[in-house]
């Protein structure tokens, strides 16, 4: 799909789906506003996954190689899925999201390790796409034989569809999954209220300042003591930095291979 076709497709879609057209406009406007922000540096140093886990759980000695081995089959299954959709162009109904439209391997392994260690009962995430990171969370819940993941996502572009949201997730893992269709603006507060206290909140939806701050502020009161707030792409704007500074929290920053992205980790400790 060339740029002109993509543009015309968006106009037509917005005309017949005005609600999604509003979402598209809000995304564009917020992204444009964020582009004018001066991104402030984080004073805390980023760490590799093993150091992050050691910082959180000093009594454990979790190795990345062991995590890779434990998730080897899942990783292989997800790679097979990605290879199948690579033959289609982006954007299209068959490939509605870019192939690299997911959090990094280190982030996925961290999610898996965290869920294996703390054995959460309730997790809420925003943003699913193909469901790669979702699969790593669900793999841990499947092995734990307990826990529920609530995932919120929507399709608001003409080449997106509910069918492709979470399409990479292996069927056997879906017993621990509850998908909620809609934007986080519409659905997050309702999901949090019905879920009660949660162990983990993960932001991985629209990475704009306004949306991220909204999600952090909404989720934080619902997170249990010793629970976690996690966020991908914290260098997109200053929301994560401002949030933990205002709350007087010490973040843990997971470094990623490309060094242009960071995964943010906040542990809630009230006592």
Model feature map: region roles:
Residues 56-59, 70, 84, 191, ...:
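Residues that form generic nucleotide/phosphate-binding pockets
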Residues 3, 97-271:
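S-adenosylmethionine/decaboxylated-SAM
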Residues 3-6, 20-23, 48-55, 63-73, ...:
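Exposed alpha-helical structural elements
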């Amino acid at each position: 799909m060339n740029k002109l076709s993509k543009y015309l497709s968006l106009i037509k879609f917005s005309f017949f789906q005005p609600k999604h057209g509003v979402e598209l406009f809000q995304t564009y406007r917020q992204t444009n506003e964020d582009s004018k922000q001066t991104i402030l540096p984080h004073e805390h140093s980023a760490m590799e996954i093993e150091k992050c886990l050691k910082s959180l759980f000093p009594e454990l000695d979790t190795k990345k190689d062991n995590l890779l081995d434990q998730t080897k089959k899942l990783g292989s299954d997800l790679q097979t899925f990605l290879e199948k959709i690579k033959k289609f162009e982006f954007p299209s109904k068959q490939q509605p999201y870019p192939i690299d439209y997911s959090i990094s391997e280190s982030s996925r392994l961290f999610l898996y390790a965290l869920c294996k260690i703390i054995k959460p009962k309730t997790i809420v995430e925003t943003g699913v796409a193909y469901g790669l990171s979702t699969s790593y969370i669900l793999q841990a819940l499947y092995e734990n034989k307990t826990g529920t993941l609530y995932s919120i996502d929507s399709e608001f572009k003409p080449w997106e569809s509910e069918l492709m949201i979470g399409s990479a997730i292996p069927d056997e893992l879906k017993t621990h999954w509850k998908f909620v269709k809609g934007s986080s603006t519409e659905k997050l507060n309702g999901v949090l209220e019905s879920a009660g206290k949660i162990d983990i909140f993960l932001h991985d939806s629209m990475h704009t300042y306004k949306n991220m701050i909204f999600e952090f502020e909404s989720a934080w009161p619902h997170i249990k003591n010793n629970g976690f707030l996690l966020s991908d792409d914290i260098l997109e704007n200053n929301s994560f930095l401002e949030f933990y500074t205002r709350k007087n929290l010490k973040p843990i920053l997971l470094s990623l291979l490309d060094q242009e992205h960071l995964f943010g980790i906040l542990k809630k400790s009230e006592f």
